[in-house]
Structure formats: structure tokens, C-alpha cells
């Protein structure tokens, strides 16, 4: 009799997990449930699957509300009905129009009203009025009793008990942003919205058997056939499966000849073998759609990187989906697709951050808005945010909330309500709070997506489904990962800047040629990789130096072992040790030497686990991948795992291996599989790193300008500006006659973009550039103020940063002139149209001189950093006993160094103490790294940006010098002479 059950996907309303509802219902003797979250369809299949597991009949519905007002409950009679309900919710979300007060005509649904939009006698055959149990006694005096065929039991389920009711009320307050004392009864559920013992509702409504019968009729006449199947995905690209295979074969074979030459037997055999598996598993359309997306991107000049396990496929390489040669790197196709793999294949396609939306728009237009949507993610209540939300709802002052957040164990300091916060915070922890957009997952369906979910329009203009990637996997949808990154943006922009600044058209797509360039390899080996994608961090630069990395294969390995899991396991250090001392280890078995020789016997990659399992024990590659996947997940107790484990040891015994050897190899497989990384993924990143390195090597100024303009790198803008200077650029502050909105370059001079002036309005910055491009340079401050509508305050920002230095006047003289020429009431026009313009009266100024360092202090205030050498601002002339380039000459010695703070990394030791790895630059601009162990860090902590004098011992780690800090002190700047 329960036709209105809510889960916590009735956001900030429900309190049940979807799986709990059928489990609890079963305990109450209920055999059918209608699952109807409020304006949400996230957990529909989750609920259906849970019901089937419990032997409960699942029925799907949606409770439609507008601005918290209950409009009607829609119940799907079948899958077509579910599509109708999802479509109704979708149309409202996409159009932005409110839901209709009266439900539209629906052919396959039941509609239940609480507040009738028309006379009961006008209700359609499938429309009813819902009567709550507590309203039964009022029926005898209501005209509704005359229409018994139009009444049903309406007993919502929202929580399990009174604690659940209280949690519900707190959720409602969070939703409405009010304190608990202001919560109105109409804004929350009634305390009676719980499951009742079997027979309770029938007893309440026993005087009205028609109502019971009507309700049972609805339950009996509804069913759902929702199933998980790969057929939900778009099945063909061309419209016919056979034509898909023909097209894919044609593209793959011609691509193979283009990539490898006409007579590369091994490449062609692998291509044909992969095509056979792709066809058998029904993935032709998946490959062709991915190819189509990449083809479109290339047609409009966008760069891309294909990565993930998809780069294990030679067909993907032949189709230009990836630029990783699987033959060169011995990559196994079975890591990507094999008949034993239950999860769908996965291509990760990266585009520049400023191109991705256009590619996404193409996909929606090409494959249809009813069939295309982005995946959702669930932002959940968690951690400190729960305490803050509940603290506000309970009316606690911010100071009391801060105390609870900062000192959760200090019970004696807590507000008395803290115990309620912890109690109910634990109850709502991990409840979804709101839906947002997945990083890049896109679904393309065969039937309209509304058969499974409603769609919700997001601020970016694209709709999302209501479920996340795990919900998609449960339904066996294949997602297309269309992702964005800044690295591709700076590569593309650098190519454009080289063309613009030097008139050279360069090709960065011939990665094979770039990988063999001796100058690029030397740049890699030096570790001078600031700005280069994935390899610019202090840790990575140090690793490259330690490994003397100068080729693609070693960079692929370095990109893997730098990851936290490998480093923390100790295998990164073992890898470096074996690289430097090849005689210090022996291979466990000849198979290790044959197949892990390039990584010195260390299982760096997921593919390495597959290789050892396959070549050592004889499990086929499909089984090896299944075993690898189980070991990296949480299914080590599964039947499949035990079967493969038993087969591994049986095969080893048949091959005559000693038991001790078999067990040790198994132990290593188990331990390595937990942190190993996809080799194809690393290879894709390494290829992009080489493109960045090529540009940094041959066109460093254009490259660094592009890095500055794409933001989001490892370092701050200040550091990239510094690196550009180190590469030979002359750095100029923003200028109204030379700067554009973004940073630009003329020859070897880089002008900081107007975007970097923190206080300058974006609209004004664009107007300054556009006016100059149309009518030419500004001729004077007066000319500028007559052509640009600018406030006095904004004009002062420009004067202070030096944007009018070309006038020959200093900032004080310009400030005086500003008072004479700035008039906010004038009509702002190009000076050539001002026929009767008059010059301001001549006046004599006193000598207005700038102090020595005030420009630097203005730059710090307005840009966030000085454009001069920050060491010039120090009170002391001391620059350290040694500089960065001298550190190797002072190994083991205690020295003083003076450095300008660049960044630091927090690390927790095995004992739980905090330590830092720091990076600084010396007076000459060269990097040096510092190590701050817990005692040192506790006594001498970093105090923000600026220069520090550090005392410590110079140590060496595989040829990479750093300073173990014992003492540190921040050095004061000279005083700003104006204050």
C-alpha cells in the first residue's frame, strides 16, 4: 500500500538509502513498493535491483514538486510510463519553465493528486486523489466520499523512526537555509511518514474498501522491465552493424599502412586480430564514435590526447585516437578489451580546456539531445562541512562552530548542542546534497535516455543524467570521456604564438621525430622542465635528474613511479637504486629479466602484472587481466579469484617451479598490483610531455607566454614569469599601448596581460584593447580618458602599475594630470572626431620623484608579485654562503643559503608527524630544494611568500643535491618609502 517512498535522493528531504527501502519493507511484510523520489530519478535502477534481490515488486514513480509545493505523484505502469515521467521532468528542467499545476495527458501512468487542480469528477481514468491515514475520519463529511473510485491510500515513507524525522527536519533547514526554530510544518514531512506493521493501513481504511482496492489495483497493474544491458548504448555508427565493421576495418587497415608502412607484417596481424575481438564484443560503434569525435576536433584545429587503457589498442593508434604505439611499448590489447572483461572499454580523450565545450556541443548535435547527456556526480555531506551546516541550522555562533570543527575531541569546550551535531551528522554523512557534472563522461544511447533517467540542465548549458558513473556501469552504459586539461592549451597556443611572433609554422604532432631530437632529450635530462606538462613539479624534476632520464621509454617509467602508491611502497626508490647499481640485484626468474628488463625487474605497470602472470604461470592474457583487475579491487574473495589463484599454482607446479618460487612471485604480484599504473596512460602523458619539451627547447619565450596564458599549472604565474625571464625574455608590466587581455610577446619582450591586474574590471580591460585595435595607440593620458569610459579608481590602478610609462611621466606627474583630464561626464569618443578639443591650462608642478622601490611594492599589491628581482628588496646584502649551482661542491657541509619561496609539499611521516619539502630560487634565479623534518618544521615554519635564510646540511640523493634544514628565518624587505 506504499505508493510514495523516498530515498535520500529526494535531496535534503529523504533519509533512506535506496537499498534500505526494500529490505525494511520485506521485514514489514510488504510485497510491492512504489519508489518516487522528489524531482529525481538517480536511484531508479539501484532500487529495482535491490527489490529483485529481496523478492519485492519494484514500481517506479516521481513526486513532482515546484518550489517545495507538492503538485502530483506520477507512477509508471510500465517502461513507457517511466519514459513519460522522465520526459515531463526533463522538459521542465531543459526549458526552465515551471512544472504544470495539472499533469499533462500521460498514456502509461497513474497520477495521484493531493490538491486537486480541477473537480474530482473531471479526473481522467488514471488520475486519483490521495488520502492520508490521518484524514480518514474527515472523509465522512467530504464530498470526495461520493467518488470512491477516485481515491487511493497516500501514506508516504520518508524516514524510519523519530530520529530519522529529526534528521529530516535538519535536512529541510539546510535546504531552506533557516534555523530549526523557523521551520514551518508545511516545509517538511509529517512525523507519520514511516513504514507501518503489516495490515495497519488496511485496518485504518477498512470502512472504505474501494480505496484499498484502488490502491491495490495500481500496485497490481504496474511493472518495470528495466534491465542492465550493453544494448542501451548506441549500437551502430553507420546504421548497420556490418557496415560499421567494414568502415572500421577500412580505417584501421589504411591507418596501419600510414603509421607503420605498407609491409609491416606484425602491425597488420595485430590490427586484424584486434578487429576480430572488437567485432565479436560489439564495440565497432564505440570505436567509430570515438574516431568521429577526434576527427571533428582535428577538422577545426583542436589538439587532443588519447589516453587510458585505450592506448593499448593498435586500432586506436591507427585511427589517430591515440598517439601511443603499442608495439613500441609492448602494450597488451587484452588490458583494454577481452572477452572476460565485464566492464566496458574506456577511452580518455583530452582536449584543451578552452576547446572541450565545443567538442561536447558537437557530440550533442551529432547524436541527438534525446540520446546524449553528461554523467552526474553526487556531492555528498561530509567532514567539516556537515558540522558547519548543522551548526548554522541549530543557531550556533560561528566561534562555537569553529571550536567544534577545529577541536572535535575537546568536548569540554563544545557548545551543548555539539552532541546533536555529531549524532545527526553521522546519520546524514554521505547523503547526496546536490548533483553536479562529471569531469567528462558522456553517454550516447540507442533509445532516448528518458527510458532510464530524467535529464537536468546545468549552468554550462549541457544536460546531465541523474545517475553517476557507477549507476551507468550498473546499467552497462559505456561512457565517452571527453576531458580537458591545460597542457594541450599551452601547446596549441605556443604553436600559434610562434607563427605570430616568428612567422614559423611548426608541427608538434610528429611525436616519433620529437622523441629522437637530441636537444629535446638533453632538455629532459637536465630537468629544466618548468611549464612542461606532467614533468614540471619539484618531485618530477628531481626524479628526472636522479634517473638521468633522456628518452621516451624512461620517461614513461618515471611518469608511473612518481605516483603516490609506487613511491610510498618503496618501489620508486628500489627502481632508482637498480638503475644506478645494476649489479645490486638479481632477477627472480628469467621471465622477469625477459619481460621486465626495461624496468629492472620492478613491476611498474599494470601490464607488468599481466606479463608475469601470463609468461610465468601460463594463464592466458584474458585471465591475467581479470586477475589483475580483481587484485586492484575489492573482490579478492570472489569465486573467480580463487579459481584463477588455484590455476596459477597448478600451472606453476606443472612447469616444475619450486613452491617457494611460485609463492614469492604470487606475493610480488599481489603487492605490486595494488599500486601499479596503466602503462598506456603514462605513455600518453609522456608523449604530451615531449611536445611541451620540444617547444620549451626551441621556442622557450613563446612557450612560457602560452603557459602563463593557460593558467592552472603546478606553479604560480609569478614563477612562470620568472622562468620566461630566465629563458631570455624582457618582462614588461601591463601597458595600455602594448598589452592585450592575455599576456603577449613581441620579439623577446613579454608584456604582462591586463588580466593579471587583480583590481581591473574585465569589461574595462577588453574595452582598452578593442579601442586601441580599432583607432590605434593612445597618444596621451588625456587621449586615453577621452576614448575610454573609466572610473577614477580604475585609472589610478593603471597609473600605479605603470601602464602609461610611455608618456615619459612618472606616476605622480600622471596622478596630477589625471585630475585635469579625467571627466566622467564627457562623451567618450576617438580623438580624431573631437574638432573643438581644448588643451588643459598649463601649470607648474613641484618635483615629484618616485622612491627607489615603490614600483615593486605597487606591483606586489596589484599583480601579486614584483617584476624586479625580489632579492633587491631585502634589507640585508647577504645572499648566502653558496648558491644553488654550488651545492654539489659542499656535500655533507652545513651552509647558509638565501632563497625566495616557490612552493612546498606537506608530507605525513610514518609516525604521523608533518614535514615539508620546499623549493626556492637563489639570487640568480636557480632552483634549490629543501627538506624540513618535523622538529625543524615545528621550530622554524614557513611564513608565506618572501625570502628566507636557511641553515642546513647539503645532502645528495642519487646525484640530486638538496638542503636538510635545521634553522630558517624569513628576511625582511626594505620599507616602502611612501609610508
Which ranges hold each PLM region?
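A short helix-loop
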Residues: 203-246, 511-513
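Phosphate/diphosphate-binding loops
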Residues: 57-62, 159-164, 172-218, 335-376, ...
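Short gly/pro/ser/thr-enriched loop/turn and capping motifs at secondary-structure boundaries
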Residues: 41-42, 65-68, 158-161, 311-313, ...
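Glycine-rich, histidine-containing beta strand-loop boundary motifs that form or position
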Residues: 36-38, 60-64, 76, 153-157, ...
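Domain-core and long-helix interface of multi-subunit machines
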Residues: 1-35, 39-54, 87-169, 203-210, ...
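Noncatalytic, beta-rich nucleic-acid-contacting surfaces in large DNA/RNA-processing enzymes
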Residues: 32-35, 51, 191-192, 242-979
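Short alpha-helix plus adjacent loop in nuclease-associated cores
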Residues: 11, 64-77, 157-178, 343, ...
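Divalent metal-coordination and catalytic microenvironments
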Residues: 4, 37, 58, 78, ...
Amino acid at each position: 500500500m506504499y505508493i510514495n517512498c523516498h530515498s535520500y535522493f529526494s535531496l535534503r528531504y529523504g533519509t533512506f538509502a535506496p537499498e534500505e527501502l526494500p529490505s525494511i519493507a520485506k521485514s514489514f511484510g510488504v510485497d510491492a513498493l512504489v519508489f518516487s523520489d522528489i524531482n529525481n530519478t538517480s536511484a531508479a535502477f539501484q532500487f529495482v535491483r535491490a527489490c529483485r534481490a529481496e523478492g519485492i515488486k519494484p514500481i517506479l514513480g516521481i513526486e513532482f514538486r515546484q518550489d517545495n509545493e507538492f503538485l502530483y505523484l506520477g507512477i509508471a505502469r510500465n517502461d513507457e510510463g517511466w519514459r513519460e515521467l522522465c520526459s515531463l521532468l526533463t522538459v521542465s528542467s531543459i526549458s526552465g519553465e515551471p512544472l504544470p499545476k495539472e499533469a499533462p495527458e500521460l498514456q502509461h501512468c497513474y497520477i495521484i493528486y493531493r490538491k486537486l487542480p480541477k473537480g474530482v469528477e473531471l479526473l481522467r481514468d488514471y488520475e486519483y486523489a490521495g488520502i492520508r491515514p490521518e484524514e480518514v475520519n474527515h472523509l465522512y463529511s467530504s464530498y470526495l466520499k461520493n467518488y470512491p473510485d477516485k481515491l487511493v491510500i497516500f501514506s508516504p515513507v520518508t524516514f524510519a523512526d523519530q530520529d530519522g524525522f529529526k534528521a529530516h527536519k535538519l535536512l529541510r533547514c539546510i535546504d531552506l537555509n533557516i534555523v530549526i526554530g523557523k521551520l514551518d510544518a508545511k516545509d517538511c514531512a509529517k512525523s507519520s511518514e514511516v513504514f507501518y506493521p503489516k495490515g495497519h493501513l488496511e485496518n485504518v481504511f477498512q470502512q472504505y474498501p474501494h480505496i484499498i482496492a484502488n490502491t491495490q489495483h495500481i500496485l497490481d497493474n504496474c511493472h518495470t522491465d528495466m534491465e542492465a544491458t550493453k544494448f542501451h548504448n548506441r549500437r551502430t555508427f553507420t546504421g548497420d552493424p556490418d557496415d560499421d565493421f567494414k568502415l572500421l576495418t577500412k580505417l584501421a587497415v589504411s591507418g596501419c599502412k600510414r603509421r607503420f608502412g605498407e609491409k609491416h607484417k606484425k602491425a597488420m596481424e595485430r590490427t586484424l586480430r584486434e578487429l576480430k575481438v572488437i567485432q565479436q564484443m560489439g564495440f565497432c560503434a564505440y570505436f567509430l564514435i570515438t574516431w568521429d569525435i577526434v576527427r571533428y576536433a582535428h577538422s577545426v584545429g583542436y589538439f587532443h590526447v588519447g589516453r587510458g587503457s585505450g592506448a593499448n589498442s593498435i586500432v586506436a593508434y591507427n585511427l589517430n585516437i591515440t598517439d601511443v604505439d603499442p608495439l613500441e611499448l609492448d602494450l597488451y590489447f587484452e588490458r583494454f578489451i577481452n572477452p572476460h572483461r565485464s566492464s566496458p572499454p574506456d577511452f580518455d580523450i583530452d582536449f584543451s580546456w578552452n576547446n572541450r565545450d565545443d567538442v561536447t556541443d558537437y557530440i550533442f548535435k551529432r547524436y541527438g539531445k534525446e540520446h546524449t547527456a553528461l554523467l552526474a556526480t553526487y556531492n555528498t555531506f561530509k567532514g567539516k562541512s556537515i558540522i558547519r551546516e548543522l551548526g548554522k541550522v541549530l543557531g550556533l555562533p560561528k566561534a562555537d562552530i569553529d571550536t567544534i570543527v577545529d577541536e572535535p575531541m575537546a568536548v569540554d569546550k563544545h557548545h551543548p548542542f555539539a552532541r546533536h551535531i555529531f549524532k545527526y551528522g553521522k546519520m546524514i554523512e554521505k547523503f547526496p546534497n546536490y548533483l553536479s557534472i562529471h569531469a567528462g563522461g558522456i553517454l550516447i544511447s540507442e533509445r532516448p535516455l528518458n527510458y532510464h533517467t530524467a535529464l537536468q540542465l546545468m549552468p554550462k548549458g549541457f544536460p546531465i543524467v541523474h545517475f553517476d558513473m557507477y549507476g551507468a556501469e550498473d546499467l552497462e552504459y559505456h561512457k565517452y570521456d571527453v576531458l580537458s586539461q591545460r597542457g594541450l592549451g599551452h601547446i596549441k597556443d605556443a604553436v600559434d604564438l610562434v607563427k605570430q611572433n616568428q612567422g614559423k609554422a611548426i608541427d608538434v604532432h610528429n611525436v616519433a621525430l620529437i622523441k629522437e631530437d637530441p636537444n629535446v632529450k638533453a632538455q629532459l635530462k637536465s630537468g629544466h622542465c618548468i611549464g612542461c606538462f606532467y614533468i614540471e613539479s619539484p618531485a618530477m624534476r628531481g626524479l628526472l635528474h636522479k634517473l638521468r632520464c633522456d628518452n621516451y621509454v624512461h620517461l614513461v617509467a618515471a611518469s608511473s613511479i612518481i605516483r603516490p602508491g609506487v613511491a610510498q611502497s618503496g618501489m620508486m626508490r628500489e627502481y632508482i637504486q637498480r638503475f644506478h647499481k645494476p649489479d645490486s640485484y638479481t632477477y627472480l626468474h628469467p621471465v622477469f629479466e625477459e619481460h621486465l628488463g626495461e624496468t629492472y625487474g620492478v613491476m611498474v605497470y599494470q601490464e607488468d602484472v599481466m606479463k608475469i602472470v601470463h609468461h610465468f604461470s601460463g594463464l592466458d592474457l584474458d585471465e591475467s587481466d581479470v586477475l589483475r583487475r580483481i587484485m586492484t579491487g575489492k573482490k579478492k574473495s570472489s569465486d573467480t579469484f580463487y579459481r584463477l589463484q588455484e590455476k596459477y599454482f597448478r600451472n606453476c607446479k606443472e612447469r616444475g617451479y619450486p613452491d617457494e618460487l611460485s609463492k614469492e612471485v604470487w606475493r610480488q604480484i599481489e603487492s605490486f598490483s595494488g599500486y601499479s599504473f596503466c602503462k598506456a596512460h603514462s605513455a600518453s602523458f609522456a608523449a604530451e610531455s615531449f611536445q611541451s619539451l620540444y617547444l620549451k627547447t626551441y621556442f622557450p619565450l613563446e612557450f612560457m607566454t602560452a603557459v602563463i596564458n593557460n593558467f592552472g599549472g603546478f606553479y604560480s604565474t609569478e614563477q612562470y614569469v620568472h622562468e620566461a625571464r630566465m629563458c631570455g625574455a624582457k618582462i614588461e608590466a601591463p601597458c595600455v599601448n602594448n598589452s592585450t587581455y592575455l599576456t603577449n610577446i613581441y620579439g623577446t619582450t613579454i608584456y604582462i596581460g591586463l588580466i593579471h591586474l587583480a583590481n581591473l574590471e574585465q569589461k574595462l580591460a577588453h574595452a582598452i584593447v578593442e579601442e586601441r585595435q580599432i583607432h590605434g595607440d593612445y597618444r596621451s593620458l588625456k587621449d586615453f580618458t577621452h576614448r575610454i569610459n573609466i572610473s577614477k579608481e580604475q585609472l589610478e590602478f593603471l597609473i600605479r602599475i605603470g601602464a602609461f610609462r610611455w608618456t615619459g611621466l612618472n606616476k605622480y606627474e600622471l596622478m596630477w594630470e589625471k585630475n585635469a583630464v579625467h571627466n566622467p561626464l564627457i562623451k567618450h569618443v576617438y580623438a580624431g572626431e573631437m574638432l573643438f578639443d581644448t588643451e588643459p591650462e598649463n601649470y607648474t608642478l613641484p618635483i615629484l620623484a618616485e622612491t627607489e622601490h615603490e614600483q615593486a611594492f605597487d606591483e606586489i599589491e596589484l599583480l601579486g608579485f614584483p617584476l624586479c628581482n625580489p632579492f633587491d628588496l631585502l634589507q640585508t646584502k647577504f645572499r648566502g654562503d653558496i648558491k644553488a649551482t654550488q651545492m654539489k661542491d659542499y656535500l655533507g657541509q652545513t651552509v647558509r643559503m638565501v632563497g625566495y619561496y616557490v612552493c612546498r609539499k606537506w608530507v605525513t611521516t610514518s609516525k604521523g608527524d608533518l614535514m615539508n619539502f620546499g623549493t626556492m630560487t637563489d639570487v640568480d634565479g636557480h632552483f634549490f630544494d629543501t627538506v624540513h623534518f618535523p622538529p625543524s618544521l615545528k621550530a622554524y615554519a614557513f611564513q608565506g611568500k618572501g625570502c628566507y635564510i636557511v641553515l642546513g646540511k647539503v645532502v645528495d640523493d642519487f646525484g640530486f643535491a638538496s638542503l636538510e634544514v635545521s634553522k630558517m628565518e624569513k628576511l625582511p624587505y626594505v620599507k616602502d618609502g611612501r609610508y
